[in-house]
Amino acid sequence: MLQPKRRKYRKEQKGRNTGKATRGNAVSFGEFGLKAMGRGRLTARQIESARRAMTRHIKRGGRIWIRIFPDKPISKKPAEVRMGNGKGNPEYYVAEIQPGKMLYEMDGVSEDLAREAFRLAAAKLPIATNFVVRQVGT
């Protein structure tokens, strides 16, 4: 699963996920893309699960790019622990997603195959997504 190799600080504040994606919102590497329409957090497990669903569907053909990386640690206190006594330990990592962010890209397969692979991947994700095709000249 994806997670940072090193971090300057082990824990991070919650913050607010506002606005829409101004960077990473175009198809840059492949021919087809899966774009986020909603806002939310994708865990490393969800990103990997969607990747596996796509990879299994396209079999040996094509190439997949993951355009997001889970770099934000989410901490959690153990079960049945009283409040206070500091912040919990990092449990997993998430990628903060704004509307318009390109999540995955694919190349080397037909549009029908890519569309179906992205449909299977989107079923694994907790946010609304759209299938997009690269515009001519970009």
Curated annotation (Swiss-Prot):
GO terms for biological process: translation. One of its GO terms (cellular component) is cytosolic large ribosomal subunit. Keywords: Ribonucleoprotein, Ribosomal protein, RNA-binding, rRNA-binding, tRNA-binding. SUPFAM superfamilies: Ribosomal protein L16p/L10e. One of its GO terms (molecular function) is structural constituent of ribosome. Residues 1-24 are annotated as: Disordered. PANTHER family: 50S/60S RIBOSOMAL PROTEIN L16, LARGE RIBOSOMAL SUBUNIT PROTEIN UL16M. Binds 23S rRNA and is also seen to make contacts with the A and possibly P site tRNAs. Part of the 50S ribosomal subunit. Belongs to the universal ribosomal protein uL16 family. HAMAP family: Ribosomal_uL16 (MF_01342). This is Large ribosomal subunit protein uL16. It comes from Cupriavidus necator (strain ATCC 17699 / DSM 428 / KCTC 22496 / NCIMB 10442 / H16 / Stanier 337). The gene is rplP.
